Amino acid sequence: VVFDDVYIEGITKISAKDIRYAKEMGSAIKLLGVARNTDTGIEAYVCPMLIPNDHPLATVNDSYNAVFVHGDAVEDAMFFGRGAGELPTASAVVGDIFDIVRNIKANCCGRIGCTCYKELPVKKMEDTYNRYFLRLHVEDRCGVLAEMTEVFAKYHVSGAQILQRDSQRQDDHLEEVV
């Protein structure tokens, strides 16, 4: 995978309100790096994702990182540990120094990589299927919800939940979360 083909989006667009709504929907928002081999190409992206609270990745917080792997033989496996802070950073630096020393002693530049390489297309982010939520500012009138569902149906968008809060009322509008 060429790095430029990987879709990357940070967390700067995520608000405290987004986090509250995700929590109300039984989910957490996590910044994930995803690599998935599909029949139509490789999915490779880094972006905030909505994760159900019962998924092991939803419990990864603070300076901890995790790698979640799903494979034919292992099914689901998660590797979990500190990924930031004084000791993990020092450990990574020491590991890099050992690699450099090994390379100097062996008179080579790096280890032998995978020799089973196969070029596959990387899918565009808009061609992947994921869970999202939309926060819509809509008029407070009869029929708005029906109009929203009509538009979703037209574009084959399936909604799992709809949240409507009177406390989010602004002028003659409501905030709907789908």
What are these regions (language model features)?
Residues A92, I97-V178:
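A conserved regulatory-domain signal marking ACT and ACT-like small-molecule sensing domains
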Residues V1-V2, H70-A77, D127-Y129:
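Short acidic (Asp/Glu) and glycine-rich catalytic loops that position anionic groups and cofactors
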Residues V1-T59, Y64-A66:
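Substrate-binding/catalytic subdomain of NAD(P)-dependent oxidoreductase enzymes
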Residues E75-A77, G81-L87:
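Glycine-rich phosphate/pyrophosphate-binding beta-alpha loops
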Residues K13-K17, Y64, A84, P88-G95, ...:
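Conserved active-site and cofactor/substrate-binding residues in soluble primary-metabolism enzymes
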